[in-house]
């Protein structure tokens, strides 16, 4: 009996959310809205720019690298603005430029992101700070720059591109994972600062996207544990999902692919089960084959081989100690040593 009741409750809740999405707040209007995308010169950002341009919207891209006309990353019709989004002064200065030359930005897509793929102790302070500035702090800068205009015209949409790794971060992604977790928290706080989502009088909506692994250079070399359960996502497909969401005025969160909806639950289960999930999914060791966004590939490969050699050497040494101790124990001359798994890292 409980099954049909829960099914009915789920359907009624979904119907309510769909009605509220269409009834309250804005719907995307390409003739009226100006879209600004950070990190829009490549990867997902470039596909988002292409999608909105194809719908006849006005699109501005903030990126530290501006693609040359005629190259693969260049999208005809996009207004490219060279801007280091990790630099607060540049963001505020270029926001004023866009305001004066293009118009009032009513859709902000915070997409810029970088990663280093190193152990925390191997990260320099500059690399840590740069990752947090580009991935997290830049969203604070752009929201501070453009949200007042949205509130003034009672029309706006702020889309935050986070990641499933903001819920479950692997080793060697401490700064990246922390930045994506921060984006999720930023989205939640901002959403309720703007008012109750279903009866929002500010006119500004928020949307959070938490995709799985994208098929881009950022995570080049990182294998996916299953092409069926955890497939690499095509940026073009993700951009289409984002456009479809804003077209119908969606708010809340989008987690793709399917496993993205399960990842947050891992944090609430007993740790042995969570550890088993990490092991079976391969997430704990996934970044060992990372080659994207690095100029130290040779050094990292050498370092990985050195680490492996050290571990093997230590295991052999431990095995020898145990063998000697067993022999001595048989003769009753010594106790067996206690070996902690923490001795081998």
Segments (PLM) and residue ranges:
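Canonical Rossmann dinucleotide-binding motif of NAD(H)/NADP(H)-dependent dehydrogenases/reductases
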Residues: 22-58
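The beta1-alpha1 cofactor-binding region of Rossmann-like NAD(H)/NADP(H)-dependent oxidoreductases
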Residues: 83-93, 125
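Conserved NAD(P)H cofactor-binding loop of Rossmann-fold oxidoreductase domains
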Residues: 111-116
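Substrate-binding pocket helix/loop in short-chain dehydrogenase/reductase
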Residues: 119-120, 124-129
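Active-site helix of classical SDR
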Residues: 143, 179
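Residue(s) in the substrate-gating loop at a strand-loop-helix junction
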Residues: 163
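SDR active-site lid
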Residues: 194-259
């Amino acid at each position: 009996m409980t099954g049909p009741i829960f099914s009915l409750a789920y359907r009624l809740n979904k119907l309510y959310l769909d009605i509220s999405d269409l009834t309250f707040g804005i719907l995307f209007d390409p003739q009226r809205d100006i879209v600004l995308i950070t990190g829009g010169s490549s990867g997902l950002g470039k596909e988002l720019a292409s999608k909105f341009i194809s719908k006849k919207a006005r699109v501005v891209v903030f990126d530290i690298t501006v693609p040359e006309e005629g190259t693969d990353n260049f999208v005809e019709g996009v207004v490219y603005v060279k801007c280091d989004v990790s630099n607060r002064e540049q963001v505020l200065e270029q926001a004023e430029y866009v305001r004066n030359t293009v118009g009032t930005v009513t859709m902000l897509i915070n997409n810029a992101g970088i990663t280093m793929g190193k152990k925390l102790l191997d990260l320099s302070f500059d690399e840590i700070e740069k990752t947090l500035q580009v991935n997290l702090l830049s969203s604070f800068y752009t929201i501070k720059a453009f949200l007042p205009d949205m509130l003034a015209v009672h029309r706006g949409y702020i889309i935050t591109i986070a990641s499933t790794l903001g819920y479950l971060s692997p080793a060697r992604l401490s700064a990246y994972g922390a930045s994506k977790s921060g984006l999720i928290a930023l989205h939640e706080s901002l959403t309720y600062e703007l008012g109750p989502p279903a009866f929002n009088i500010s006119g500004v909506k928020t949307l959070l996207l938490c995709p799985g692994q994208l098929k881009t250079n950022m995570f080049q070399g990182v294998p996916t544990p299953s092409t069926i359960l955890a497939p690499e996502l095509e940026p073009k497909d993700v951009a289409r999902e984002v456009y479809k969401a804003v077209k119908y005025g969606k708010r809340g969160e989008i987690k793709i692919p399917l496993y993205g909806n399960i990842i947050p639950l891992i944090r609430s289960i007993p740790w042995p089960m969570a550890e088993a999930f990490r092991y079976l999914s391969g997430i704990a060791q996934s970044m060992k084959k990372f080659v994207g966004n690095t100029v130290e590939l040779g050094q990292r490969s050498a370092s990985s081989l050195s680490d492996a050699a050290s571990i093997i050497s230590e295991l052999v040494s431990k095995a020898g100690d145990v063998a000697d101790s067993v022999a001595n124990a048989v003769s009753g001359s010594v106790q067996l040593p206690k070996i902690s798994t923490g001795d081998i890292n």
